[in-house]
Amino acid sequence: MFKEIKNITKNYAIAEINGDINSDILNINVVIEDNDLRILGEVEDIDNGLVKIAFLGEFHEGKFYSGIIRRPSLKSNIRIINTDELKELVGENDDKSMLLGLSPLYNNYPVKINIDKMFSNHLAIFGNTGSGKTWGVSRLIQNLFNLNGKIAFNSNIFIFNNTDEYHNAFSSINKYNSNFNYKMYSTSRSDNKEGLDLKIPLWLLDVDDYANLLDITDYFQINIIEKMLCYVSAFAKNDQDAIKYKNHLIAKAIISVLYSNQVSAKIRDQIFNILKDCYTDELNLDVQVPGVGYTREFRKCFDIDNTGEFVERILVTAYIQSFIDNNTKWSEEYTPTYFTLDQLEVALNFTLISEGLLLNEKSYGEAIALKVKLHTLNNSSNKKFFEVNQFMTLDQYISSLILFDSSRRAQIINFVFDEIDDRLAKSLVKIFSRMVLRFSKMQAVRGSIPIHIMLEEAHRYVQNDRDSELLGYNIFERIAKEGRKFGVILDLITQRPTELSSNVLSQCSNFLIFKLNHPADLEYVEKMVPNISKDVIEKQKALQAGTCVAFGLMMKIPMVVKMQIPNPPPTSSNASIYDKWIIEWNNK
């Protein structure tokens, strides 16, 4: 079949072949033997009786090692790999391996992957719409739950998607084993939806979470959020200390305005604006201010006489100053405690008056933007996602997500962000990702509870946005760089890799690339994916639906892999226009 080698370069050998050989050997692996040297190659091109063979690595004592040190001589022999060598390349059939798919080049020979090498590293899955990407993901997870003699009982796979397309594929995983369970949380407002209502405890969100949730545009707003959280923590108990603190803040804010260099009418308007949003039983517009032998309604104290002065300036000033307590050391630390969006909005209002932010032209825009966004959230249908009935810690919350019932756990938790806008969905994915990373860092034994964060339509979330500029980091970049140490792994699934953060993509170690057509996507993947070759890029151009090029730490060499049809499949197929539009018609 193969004749003598005509030429050897750094990475290739050019050899003659018999004239009756056709293109069936294209992409087939061969072994080039030169005494004790056995080099693995792949037939990349056939032209006029010559084949171009790319060097991939070497076999030593039956084991394959990527890369070569020595080149073969021109006298070397070339043959197609044998069964033992093929087994070495497609993975070992042992307890730590699982089925990935089948090799169409080798008569559907099973391709096995090491579970650790696959699931301990970040994964990227690319492919056009209709390339079989979602079906491939479904089959990959189904294979994990269909091992022989062992079960993935302690697996934790958090799926984030804007549709429930994976529900059909995973809702019946207990058919593999009764210990397997699946949960779905949904943001749908439909009464007929499947899945549980999504609920997120507000006190588990940190400053950066609120920065994303309220879509900040300036670093200055982070300081406002920090102060807001301190106040909501201090006010949450609503005890005498909390009331005294509120009175202290209101009184200081009013006094600062009262003694400002402004006309009386403007001072009155600003004080009334303060008390419109921030008030207590003791300090409000309707409270009776006691004088000597009489009382005066608070708002009436600010009536202006014909000299332009307040009629009860001395009386009201003394009353307000009686609530200022500069001797008490008020807590400036945020302690997670139960609170609601209503209480958070109150805390923000106190933050704005205590810092005088609404009276400062430079800070007014950023301050009022936060106020409007929080008020909008608190008065929208999205408020229900943050309505939790009782306090729980982060550990308890993550456990509640995983817990299936009082005695069983779920292995797959599917978060479906439907009927909400993309901005909120992106914020929620970031919030959950931060929670998962914090939870994993809390564990006494590092990496003891591995969790996969699977992002369908990953380009919606993992972007080159302003988080690095405003917060100093991007949560997905942080997980990509340090998450593996703590068992937090990203799975990025997208048809638009050009929109992914390059810093995150460069940290991925495993890849399943289904068919991609757009030149910009192909160029980006070739540029950003570590160790990808032009040959891999060329291979994926001719892939059938449901077939991918698999490479990375999980594979010995890049291989074309045919993913088996998932059973049951996801609901990701296109609508059947013929069935829905076309009817029988007998026009007589």
What positions do the PLM features span?
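Long, basic/Gly/Ser/Thr-rich N-terminal segments
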Residues: M1-L89
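P-loop NTP-binding catalytic core
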Residues: E61-H122, S572
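Glycine-rich phosphate-binding loop of nucleotide-binding enzymes
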Residues: L99-T187, A253, S502, A550, ...
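The conserved Walker
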Residues: T129, S468, P497
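P-loop NTPase motor domains
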Residues: D164-S171, K199-I475
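Conserved ATP-driven motor cores of ASCE-family P-loop NTPases powering translocation/secretion/packaging/pilus
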Residues: L471-G472, E477-K562
